[in-house]
Amino acid sequence: MADQQTTMPRWVPLLLGLLGSTTCGMLLYAWSVFIKPLNAEFGWSRAEIAMAFAICCLIFGLMTFPAGRLSDKMGPRKVVMTGGVLLAIGFILSGFIQSKYQLYITYGVIAGFGGGMIYLPPIATAPKWWPDRRALATGFAVVGLGLGSFLMGPLATYIIEKPGMGWRYVFWYCGVAMGIMALIAGAFLEPPPAGWKPAGYTPPAPPAGAAAPKVTRDWTYEEAKGDTKFWLLYLAYFCGSFAGLMVIGHLAGFGRDAGLTAMAAAGAVSSLAFSNAATRILSGWFVDKIGIRVYFAALFALQTAAMIAIFQLGGSVVGLSIVAIVIGWNYGAMFTLFPATCLQFYGPTAQGSNYGLLFTACGLAGFAGPWVGGWLKDTTGTYYLPFLCAAALCALGTAIVFMTKPPEKKHA
């Protein structure tokens, strides 16, 4: 067993994961503040603008799978640092675009590609340092997704509205900052040595009087992807992500349509982001204390209700912020609960590959949710139908996560 004293302090991977996920949060979750400026300058429809965000979410989500495989094989450091360079290039180039197709390539493809490489390796690495608090470690590593959007929403709005600046400066300034953040996050990230465990930690013993446990092993990637329960989790992840990303992609636009000012709508985005961040840590704590399945199902059910309540409450700053907080809480919790569930079901050995494949559901939902929301809004003139569809998917997700139990352990 590796000597505990020869390794880095185990809180370091948590901070590096936080920094990396904050970078990804800045990339993705404040996109709705760009809707009005891009519409005003270019006359693009909501669906056309949402397509850039949808492509970014798709590429981001799909890229996590090869990023996880590469992280398992060659370590997380090179993967994250390469992603940081690509993200910075794509974001900065987005400040020079003159057509929607250029934006689709720079922001959607290049920045999304880089973001996907940054996101997954820290999530797969951090829990390996915390076998005694895996869900909590996962939650802390991903809390930056909410923190990044909490920072980016008002910051981007301030730059956009500042005389002599505008939306292009957001891409330029923030692109440089995000690249630096990702390079720092990747430069020091590494998994623990083989056989390492924290000082004083002893794996839980079986209950008194229980039969001697059989020797078990973790599931391989090939075994996990052949398990029916894996694909039930995949479907549930798609349902929850579809609803959450639809709202994130259109929340500020919904608020502006309801008569709120740009800063008030951005405030609702920040409320969602703050809740999105807080739940990633607190949900991990709840899971470590009370278990995952019932808590998971309750959150899906609550998000279903919030998707419907937005039409009654979304016309005021306070009402929209309350709904945003609820949606942000439940959406953000998924990014603690799904990796923790994947880890619980299939073990840590192939977590990078297993969760990388599972996370592609979020990428597909990220493409479908914002674009479908924008297209239905343009077609019907209201967000009623897209948000109702999202509520139905959340209800389906509730049933799936409540009924899906861990698979049998593999025997060595």
From Swiss-Prot:
One of its GO terms (cellular component) is plasma membrane. Inhibited by the protonophore carbonyl cyanide m-chlorophenylhydrazone (CCCP), but not by valinomycin. Changing H250F: Loss of transport activity. The chain crosses the membrane at residues 11-40, 46-74, 76-95, 100-129, 134-160, 168-187, 228-257, 262-290, 293-313, 317-346, 351-380, 383-403. Changing Y383A: Loss of transport activity. It is found in: Cell inner membrane. GO terms for molecular function: symporter activity. Changing Y331F: No change in transport activity. Proton-coupled L-lactate specific transporter. This is L-lactate transporter. It comes from Syntrophobacter fumaroxidans (strain DSM 10017 / MPOB). The lineage of its organism: Bacteria, Pseudomonadati, Thermodesulfobacteriota, Syntrophobacteria, Syntrophobacterales.
